[in-house]
Amino acid sequence: MVKSMKTNNRKGGYSASTANEYIDSKQAIYCLSTELETQIKFEDGQPTGEIIAYKAWFTQKGLPPFQVKFPSEVALPNYMTMVEFDNLEACEVGYNVYFRATDIKEVKY
């Protein structure tokens, strides 16, 4: 069964416990992105050109693809490589779930 990535219960701010409600730590996570997407800072509705974060897409069995934001540029592994995150946290905003982590590592079998 595919779980929805819509919120279960809304709480404020990012937390590891919220991430654990959505991501199963016993299941493999795979990298879908082959390059990072940049997030640009906006002021007064206009882009400043300043990069404030990097994002990439991942998947886990039973979940829709999900995006994780990183505060600095990370080295993405190859497409469909099994990965794990450093300090994965999630935040529920409205009915959406947003993820962030400090780094990513390839899982060696």
Residue ranges and their predicted role:
Residues 1-109:
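OB-fold and OB-like single-stranded nucleic-acid-recognition modules
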